[in-house]
Swiss-Prot record:
SS bond partners: none
GO biological process, alphabetically ordered: diaminopimelate biosynthetic process; lysine biosynthetic process via diaminopimelate
Keywords: Acyltransferase, Amino-acid biosynthesis, Diaminopimelate biosynthesis, Lysine biosynthesis, Repeat, Transferase
Enzyme nomenclature, EC number: 2.3.1.89
UniProt GO molecular function: tetrahydrodipicolinate N-acetyltransferase activity
Organism, as annotated: Lactococcus lactis subsp. lactis (strain IL1403) (Streptococcus lactis)
Family: Belongs to the transferase hexapeptide repeat family. DapH subfamily.
InterPro entries with a match to the protein in the record: DapH, DapH_N, Hexapep, Hexapep_transf_CS, Trans_hexapeptide_repeat, Trimer_LpxA-like_sf
PANTHER family: 2,3,4,5-TETRAHYDROPYRIDINE-2,6-DICARBOXYLATE N-ACETYLTRANSFERASE, ACETYLTRANSFERASE
Amino-acid biosynthesis keyword on record: yes
Primary enzyme class: transferase
Protein name (database record): 2,3,4,5-tetrahydropyridine-2,6-dicarboxylate N-acetyltransferase
Organism superkingdom: Bacteria
Length: 256
């Protein structure tokens, strides 16, 4: 799925100008303070239209006092509804961040496999048949090519780019660059394998067909079709048939 590609400066402006939100989910037994919060209609019932206009979502039976109810919205809008109620007695509250500027990506229409627990921020591009494993963290502006797997706990920083049919191993880090705006992001080519817990430093480009060994720290550009390893990473050999066999991807893992 193609997201709008943003430059570093555009991302900075997007975050800086975004309305900061502290989203909460309240589960309560009892009746919210609709009157005190100014959400009571003339007929004495909750004004659901006014609630919606404030970005507050309400679920449950609000005509029965002791039925279970759920309120979702920004803390500043929801807070007045809880006046007179006691936390952990009348209600419980779940907090999602504080003054967050970037929402999570809506993945409903993305033609990829995204496992529970992956954290993907808005303005991320994910190609068809890509795989995002649990615990992966993908920051704003990142791009993931078709058929690429981002393994468990891997981190793609802001604007990091990975080509097609690549594999970013568990715990690996592709360092992100949003500030300074002049810096270049990490770019990983097609058919690349980055081993577990490897780190690719800001601005580094990894050429197509190459392998970054587990635990390597890559501080310089990597040409195509080589294996790099060590701290800092150095070229240890060119890709040969044996290496290709060891690093081959499994198409079945990308079936949807």
């Amino acid at each position: 799925m193609e997201a709008q590609k943003l430059s570093a400066q555009e991302i900075i402006q997007f975050i800086g100008n975004a309305e900061k939100k502290t989203r909460v989910k309240v589960t309560l037994s009892g009746m919210p303070s609709f009157k005190a919060a100014g959400f009571l209609a003339e007929n004495g019932r909750p004004n659901f239209k006014a609630l919606a206009n404030k970005g507050i979502q309400v679920l449950g039976d609000f005509h029965t006092h002791y039925s279970l109810k759920i309120i979702i919205g920004d803390w500043q809008a929801v807070r007045p509804l809880l006046s007179g109620l006691t936390e952990n007695k009348d209600y419980t509250l779940e907090l999602e961040g504080r003054n967050s500027a970037v929402p999570l990506l809506d993945t409903r229409e993305i033609n990829a496999r995204i496992e529970p627990g992956a954290i993907i921020r808005d303005q991320v591009t994910i190609g068809d048949s890509a795989v995002i494993m649990m615990g992966a963290i993908i920051n704003i502006g990142a791009e993931i090519g078709e058929g690429t797997m981002i393994d468990m706990g891997a981190i793609l920083g802001g604007r990091a780019t990975v080509g097609k049919n690549s594999h970013i191993g568990a715990g690996a880090v592709l360092a992100g660059v949003i500030e300074p705006a002049s810096a270049e992001p990490v770019r990983v080519g097609d058919n690349v394998l980055v081993g577990a817990n490897a780190v690719v430093i800001e601005g580094v480009q990894v050429g197509s067909g190459s392998v970054v060994a587990a635990g390597a720290i890559v501080t310089q550009d990597v040409p195509e079709n080589v294996v790099v390893a060590g701290v800092p990473a150095r070229i240890i050999k060119e890709i040969d048939e044996k290496t290709q066999q060891k690093t081959a991807l499994e198409d079945a893992l990308r079936n949807l």
